Design a protein with these regions (language model features):
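Carbohydrate-binding surface patches
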Residues: 250-306, 310-328, 371-378
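Active-site flanking residues adjacent to catalytic metal/cofactor-binding acidic residues
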Residues: 42, 46, 157
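Beta-strand-rich recognition/accessory modules
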Residues: 356-382
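Acidic, Ser/Thr/Pro-rich beta/coil linker or hinge segments at domain junctions
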Residues: 302-360, 364
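Noncatalytic carbohydrate-binding groove/subsite architecture in carbohydrate-active enzymes
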Residues: 21-24, 58-193, 211
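Substrate-binding cleft of extracellular glycoside hydrolase catalytic domains
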Residues: 1-31, 37-39, 156
Length: 382
């Protein structure tokens, strides 16, 4: 769309469009089998509420959706079809009402949202947009969408901390900390949460050459994982089970998860799961107050089990920060293979032994969180 000038106009002949969709769907079924393709969530179009992606109006999009839905379902009712894939949570009530009236109910609801959308002044720099983004805006928008989706899956198929392809905020620990906090804020509302985008290679906006230029990828041009990539890695290590954590702070948030629990009872039998991973973030929007914070968490003993050791993994200015390693090389525009390898090493997560203190009832875990950082502490139980 940006460089290749893709056609974003409504179909001139709806019948021709339906035939195209039908033949494409039949090809998928023939090549991959209905068992496979029925697992593919198929969105109809992308951000039709933005003129750069769709030259028609809302009515034209809804007609396109209906024609596409009918064509796909005619090939197989097992196809999963949804939308409206709009930017900024737009058109969700209208889309839902139309689908109900026309009996073309989506199998899932999808939309996009960025925290910078909330400020509403597109021309403002992203730091200012984030500064003025209302607290909890991503959860608020997800809750609105969840109400409309009902029991159907809700997919946010595009998000990031900003929508800019050139923003230095994307390359540092702030991005990782904010991404983790936003992800956890909607964990109970959203079924899929898709980061835009995997790589900084985004030639449609002009092919970049500088290894760190503020691209919105999880990895830089050379495939070096950026801090946000590692942030999602720590989220995976947190596990899917949750334990309640009591306490609050303006910039620090904490979650307890089951991690990779491998505990056994004293008789060798499998013991009940316990919190084995603690994830902290210390993050504030640009131009808001933030400082290093000393945090302390007490973990009660669980019957015969108690925390016997801990390891901490950090993401901050001195941990998992390949941009700092690049700057230490003199910020070269073009990297040698050896330079790329140095950045790969600098991007790695490092587990460090972390001391704990215990009494007869509980174990205490303490650490200092620098501004705009996150840390995961893995607990080992006896």
């Amino acid at each position: 769309v940006f460089h290749y000038r893709g056609n974003v106009t409504p179909p001139k002949n709806p019948s021709d469009w339906a035939l195209l969709v039908t033949q494409l769907a039949e090809h998928w079924v023939e090549r991959y089998g209905i068992k496979e393709v029925s697992q593919w969530p198929i969105e109809v179009w992308n951000e039709p509420n933005l003129s750069m992606f769709w030259k028609g109006d809302q009515a034209a999009y809804l007609a396109l959706y209906e024609a596409t839905w009918q064509a796909l379902k005619a090939v197989s009712p097992r196809f999963h079809v949804g939308g409206p894939a709009t930017a900024q949570n737009a058109w969700l009530p209208e889309f839902d009402a139309f689908c109900r009236a026309r009996h073309c109910a989506p199998d899932f609801l999808s939309t996009h949202y960025y925290p910078t959308d909330a400020f509403g002044e597109i021309g403002a720099d992203t730091a200012t947009q984030l500064q003025h983004a209302p607290p909890g805006v991503m959860r608020k928008r997800a809750a609105e969408a969840r109400k409309i989706a009902g029991d159907r899956p809700l997919y946010y198929t595009e998000w990031n901390i900003t929508s800019s392809p050139r923003d230095a905020l994307h390359d540092g620990a702030f991005c990782a900390a904010l991404a983790v906090k936003l992800t956890m804020s909607v964990d109970d509302l959203v079924d899929a949460w898709s980061w835009w985008v995997f790589s900084d290679i985004f030639e449609e906006d002009g092919m970049p050459s500088q290894p760190f230029h503020g691209g919105f990828g999880l990895m830089n041009l050379h495939g070096v994982p950026k801090p946000v990539f590692r942030g999602f890695e720590l989220l995976q290590r947190l596990g899917t089970g949750r334990w309640q954590v009591e306490g609050s702070h303006d910039t620090v948030t904490c979650w307890a998860g089951d991690g990779e629990w491998q505990g056994k009872g004293r008789d060798g039998s499998a013991a009940r799961p316990m919190p084995s991973a603690i994830l902290w973030v210390n993050v504030a929007m640009p131009h808001h107050a933030i400082a290093s914070e000393s945090v302390r968490l007490s973990i009660p003993h669980q019957g015969d089990h108690r925390v016997k050791a801990a390891h901490a993994t950090r993401i901050d200015e001195t941990h998992a920060n390949p941009r700092a390693a690049w700057q230490a090389l003199g910020s070269p525009v073009y990297l040698s293979p050896a330079g790329v390898e140095r950045l790969q090493v600098a991007s790695q997560l490092v587990d460090e032994v972390h001391s704990v203190v215990a009494d007869d009832a509980q174990t205490w875990v303490e650490l200092v969180l620098p501004p705009q950082s996150l840390a995961l502490v893995r607990l080992e139980w006896s």
